[in-house]
Amino acid sequence: MKSLKKLKELETSDVFNTLHVRTILKVIKIDKCVSLARHSLVNITVGDDGIWFHLEDGTMINGLEYKTICEKELGFQGFIGIIILDSEDTLQELRLNPFQFKRRLIHMKVDTPEEFMLCGLVFALENLPLKQSTLHKLIARLVLFPVLSPVTKILFNTCDKLVCTLRHIFFNEHASEILHKVPPMIRLYNEMKNTHIEVLELYFNTKRSHNFINLSLESRQLQDSSLQVIQLATQFAQIFYSKNEDTSS
């Protein structure tokens, strides 16, 4: 029985090292109107006393207080996110068709202050221009937090992967402990950007400028579709939360 338990724990660990959750957005529902909202973060800083969130209204809060801020927001229902594999983000498109995408969209049941903070950090790492020193300090702080649940684990691993990816593509860090966490697809794209290898350019089928890389998935188009991630996520969220209301009423 013990060996079986260890095997299951190992399998769970492998799954969460392979998958990560991206495009974490707030679900807002007022009356019957459902919408997705971005986090109100404009910057993060890291000090000896913790991780600090700078908000759009000019206030600065400890990241562990973000739970209170979110729960006070009118109509806040929680978060949604998209589960993806390393190979599915090419930095040009998300290699999921609309049917696959629908099955990857999840309602995130986050409860603890640490989980709320990690959701905010995923957004910040995807969307904000963070300093190299901030990225270094961030991981040093995150490893101090207890990883006690599957949700915390996948959020932590996502943050870790995003930090390493940012350090590699924007700050040219190539240490082995960084590179092995950067998705191979993104490492290839970065090589293409730096060396302009025509074969890789054909593989990625890109016509955009190589000088601009964005980790946000919101504006990515889905495979074989003209729809963007944010458009389809909004459609599915409206259907899902409306159905839940009908079921509960």
From Swiss-Prot:
Keywords: Host cytoplasm, Host Golgi apparatus, Virion, Virion tegument
Function, in words: Plays a critical role in cytoplasmic virus egress. Participates in the final step of tegumentation and envelope acquisition within the host cytoplasm.
Localization, UniProt: Virion; Virion tegument; Host cytoplasm; Host Golgi apparatus
InterPro entries: Herpes_UL7 (IPR002600)
GO CC terms: host cell Golgi apparatus; viral tegument
Organism phylogeny: Viruses, Duplodnaviria, Heunggongvirae, Peploviricota, Herviviricetes
Family affiliation: Belongs to the herpesviridae cytoplasmic envelopment protein 1 family.
HAMAP family cross-referenced by the UniProt entry: HSV_CEP1
Naturally occurring in which organism (per UniProt): Human herpesvirus 6B (strain Z29)
Protein name: Cytoplasmic envelopment protein 1
